[in-house]
UniProtKB/Swiss-Prot annotation:
GO terms for cellular component: AP-type membrane coat adaptor complex. This is AP-5 complex subunit beta-1. As part of AP-5, a probable fifth adaptor protein complex, it may be involved in endosomal transport. It comes from Xenopus tropicalis (Western clawed frog). GO terms for biological process: endosomal transport; protein transport. Keywords: Protein transport, Transport. Probably part of the adaptor protein complex 5 (AP-5).
Length: 883
């Protein structure tokens, strides 16, 4: 197997990452993995390319290592590569990635256990690497590898809690002795191991009886039993665990924790957060240690500007509450959060985080125990007076501030709250002004979300709600294309305010405005939006639909709507009719609705609309109102109705949209099998009993061929002879290519699926055609033509002609067999071991070959009128001679 160069591996990796399953369908897993591992050992591949290749093992280990045998082989090969690599700074990045790749393969494929020799060797190797404290043996250049090894061990300890619990003394000594930049990784590793060991002891309940001291001083082998039962560590689970160490054990553990906390300022903010959280869990389980141990750190953390460190304060407060934080501390934190939400030097996402912290603030004595949004009791109206949203804020900040202030004014009473509600309403009106003056999509969405928030909290303020309704009506009449926004607002507020009348009031007001419109050009232009609103209003049984029916009748009778026969408009009309048919007070509008449907079924110029109107007319005039509602709301999912029944299609329910939706097939039921050699004719094979309306679609991956038209197959039954389809190929350039193939088909239950089939490969050999000559031409004429073409194809600087020679060691008999098997159709002459071959490649190119054997060596002399063909011809000749 020839080694691939760096460029080809870059393309290979990109192709694999885009679609791993499709890629592995074209080549075997074992073959590709073997090639990858082999080239990782090659000196011809750049180091950066090798890192890219190992990313496949990091991202897709389950695809490349499907069984335990493959996992062991892969891990062993990577270990051997790692051991053979020199300890140079140049190879350091590659060595670190090798460690990560080995660990990922072993953990992801569940091969990290005591029965795996590679797992044992890898764990021992990691401990050996990190034992070089302060770079005494390998030097500074090896420090990144030590850091990576620490992270690998931390990952193992996180996946298998307690795995390193019998090595705690050695880990602690290394953590204390390490004074380089790697100290951070050693500290985090030891802290995770300590927390898991405490948790393991706390699960036994009761006094530790010296078990904690033994664990802290243990220096034995790895605890492989931890790999047998993986335990998922949940932060909340530690609250139910309790460890009661003795006084001496408490003193030792407290000394260790104090030293870890003293070193915390040496760590990066993110690592500090990780360290604090691990120690918080330890203190929460070891009840004999007071949370006051964190007091010295709070002085530093209270003044921090770093997000991670501030998050550590909130984590401590959520766990320890008033055991660590006083009322003054809590008040200070709330003030700090309010100030940080508007700090000019902070980015918008950070300020939004602080706003969210206000809504989920861990209070010392919370009034409620739910995890939903709640304001702290100490947060007052005066403290939030500077948080008023304005149009200069970004949209997320605007809505978050409105949400916080709405909760503040809702929970407080008095003049401050009344003024605050008025200010918030003015803010909503300022957004309204921007939307009314043709605001963009983002500001429009923000306005409707702001309206929803205002209605959610202040729906009891009748004056503001009436003004809001008037403004919304005015906005709709000036911009009817906002109908989907209005419908969504009505739906969401109705869900939110189940027993409130405002959504119905808004719906009724919109209906009144629409039905009073004249049937002029402006109304007809926005008729589609009006019909969407009326269709939604018709779903409210408390709103009379008489005016809607009269408006629809007037629109149809007094306009050219029917003569135009627009399918979309006709179905929009019938959608309103369908919801009106389900109305409880149908008798009051029976005559008007019947006239409308009868007019549509006779006058509308679209047959589909006519049929649907006829169905609704028949139902209206022949079925009682109770049965009518059940028929139109019938869903096949809830009854025994066939999924393709007419009622399910005509009611526009979920099943109708489901049938119109093309789904992605979970597994491929179709395949194309070639039936004629040399001709692109295939038979369709199916694993399903029956498929219908099959459409085969072909997509070019390049521009070398003309597009292939879709091929339609009416049906396919598993017990019948499969149909044969022929694919017509029209090349623009005579080079190999690949067509992506997909199929769309319907199953017996009426659902349409789309699936990808195996790609269609067009090889270089398949484009060979004999010279287009009359069939009755004598051999002499063909021979003369070959000679003239051979002379004409002599290369020079003025053309693209080229000649080449291909030699391969073989006997005369072998050469004869090769020519007979591969070029018999294209042979012009065969005389005394010499062969003259002429090949035509559409659309307009040729390849001429003069083949002869000398001294058991076959010599292929080649001339062509397109030098770009030579690499493909060379590959083809290599293939046939090797065979």
């Amino acid at each position: 197997m020839a080694e691939r160069n760096s460029a080809s591996w870059n393309r290979k990796v990109a192709s694999f990452c885009s679609e791993p399953k499709t890629f592995l369908c074209d080549s075997s897993v074992d073959g590709f993995l073997g090639e990858l591992l082999k080239d990782l050992q090659s000196e011809a591949i750049h180091g950066q390319t090798k890192i890219l290749m190992m990313d496949l093992l990091l991202e897709f280990p389950e695809f490349l290592c499907p069984d335990q045998k493959t996992v062991e082989m892969t891990a062993e090969t990577l270990m051997n590569i790692l051991k053979k690599m020199p300890s140079s700074e140049r190879s350091m990045t590659l060595r670190c990635h090798l460690l990560l790749a080995i660990e990922t393969v072993l953990i992801t494929c569940e091969s990290f256990n005591q029965n795996s020799k590679m797992a044992q060797d890898f764990a021992s190797l990691l401990m050996h690497i990190i034992s070089d404290v302060n770079d005494k043996k390998q030097g500074v250049a090896n420090r990144p590898l030590r850091t990576t090894a620490c992270e690998c061990l931390r990952e193992l300890e996180s996946c298998y809690p307690g795995f390193l619990s019998q090595r705690m003394e050695k880990l602690y000594l290394m953590q204390q002795q390490e004074v380089t930049a790697a100290h951070q990784s050693y500290t985090l590793l030891y802290t995770v191991v300590l927390k898991n060991a405490i948790r393991f002891l706390a699960q036994k309940e009761g006094p530790s009886n010296g078990a904690l001291k033994n664990a802290l001083l243990s220096n034995e082998d790895f605890f492989w039993s931890a790999t047998e039962n993986m335990v998922e560590l949940q932060p909340s689970s530690n609250e139910q665990l309790l460890l009661l160490p003795s006084n001496s054990e408490t003193k030792d553990l407290k000394s260790i924790l104090a030293l870890l906390l003293e070193d915390s300022y040496l760590l990066t903010p993110v690592c500090q957060n990780t360290l604090f959280w691990q120690i918080v869990q330890v203190v929460a389980m070891a009840r004999t240690i007071s949370p006051v141990i964190f007091k010295s750190q709070l002085v530093r953390l209270f003044s921090t500007m770093d997000l991670s460190c501030f998050h550590s304060i909130l984590q401590m407060k959520a766990v320890f509450t008033d055991s660590l934080f006083t009322g003054e501390d809590e008040h200070f934190l709330i003030q700090r959060l309010v100030g940080m939400t508007q700090h000019p030097l902070l980015s918008t996402p950070v300020k939004l985080f602080y706003l969210d912290c206000l809504l989920h603030f861990p209070e010392n004595r919370p009034l409620t125990s739910n995890s939903e949004e709640n304001l702290p009791v100490l947060l007052t109206v005066q403290m939030t007076s500077s948080l008023f949203p304005n149009v200069f804020n970004d949209h997320s900040t605007m809505l978050c501030r409105q949400n916080v202030l709405s909760m503040v004014y809702l929970e407080n009473e008095g003049s401050y709250s009344e003024k605050g509600i008025a200010f918030l309403f003015e803010h909503v009106m300022s957004l309204y002004s921007m939307v009314h003056k043709n605001g963009n999509r983002e500001i429009t969405a923000t306005f409707f979300r702001a309206v929803h928030l205002f209605v959610q909290y202040f729906n009891f303020c009748e004056k503001h709600m009436e003004n809001l309704t008037e403004k919304l009506l005015k906005l709709y009449m000036s911009n009817s294309s906002l109908a989907p926004n209005f419908i969504n607002l009505i739906n969401q507020t109705q869900i939110l305010l189940e027993f409130h009348v405002w959504p119905v009031t808004l719906s009724k007001a919109l209906q009144k405005e629409i039905v009073n419109l004249p049937t002029d050009k402006w109304t007809m232009k926005n008729l589609g939006w009006h019909l969407k609103i009326l269709s939604r209003v018709a779903q409210e049984n408390s709103i009379s639909q008489s005016s809607t029916a009269l408006f629809l009748r007037r629109v149809v009778f007094c306009s050219d709507l029917c003569s135009k026969g627009d399918w979309r408009t006709g179905n929009a009309l019938l959608s309103v009719c369908k919801h009106v048919l389900q109305h409880q007070k149908l008798s009051a509008i029976f005559v008007h609705l019947a006239d409308l449907l009868q007019y549509l079924m006779h006058r509308f110029e679209d047959i589909d609309v006519q049929d649907r109107a006829r169905l609704y007319y028949v139902l209206l005039t022949n079925v009682s109102s109770d049965k009518l509602g059940k028929i139109l709301t019938m869903s096949p999912a809830r009854g025994q109705t066939k999924s393709r029944s007419l009622s399910s299609i005509m009611t526009e329910n979920e099943n109708f949209s489901t049938m119109l939706t093309i789904r992605n097939a979970e597994k491929t039921l179709l395949c194309l099998q070639p039936v004629l050699e040399g001709i692109k004719a295939f038979t369709c094979i199916s694993d399903s009993p029956s498929l219908y309306c099959i459409v085969l679609q072909f997509e070019n991956t390049d521009c070398r061929f003309e597009s292939i038209s879709d091929i339609n197959v009416p049906c396919l039954f598993v017990d019948r002879k499969p149909p044969v389809v022929t694919i017509n190929l029209v090349p623009k350039e005579p080079y190999p290519t690949i067509f992506s193939v997909s199929a769309t088909y319907s199953t017996q239950d009426g659902i349409t699926y789309q699936t990808k089939l195996d790609p269609l490969y067009i090889t270089f050999r398949e484009m060979f055609i004999p010279l287009p000559l009359p069939a009755l031409w004598p051999l002499e004429s063909r021979f003369d033509l070959f000679g003239k073409l051979w002379s004409a194809f002599k290369p020079d600087e003025q053309n693209q002609f080229e000649e080449s020679i291909f030699c391969y060691e073989m006997s005369n008999n072998s050469l004869h067999d090769i020519v007979l098997d591969n070029f018999s159709k294209f042979a012009v002459s065969c005389n005394g071991g010499e062969y003259k071959i002429a090949v035509f490649l559409p659309p307009q190119f040729h390849i001429l070959m003069h083949i002869k054997s000398q001294d058991d060596t076959a010599c292929f002399s080649v001339r062509t009128d397109n030098w770009n063909l030579l690499p493909y011809l060379n590959s083809h000749l290599l293939d046939i001679t090797l065979q």
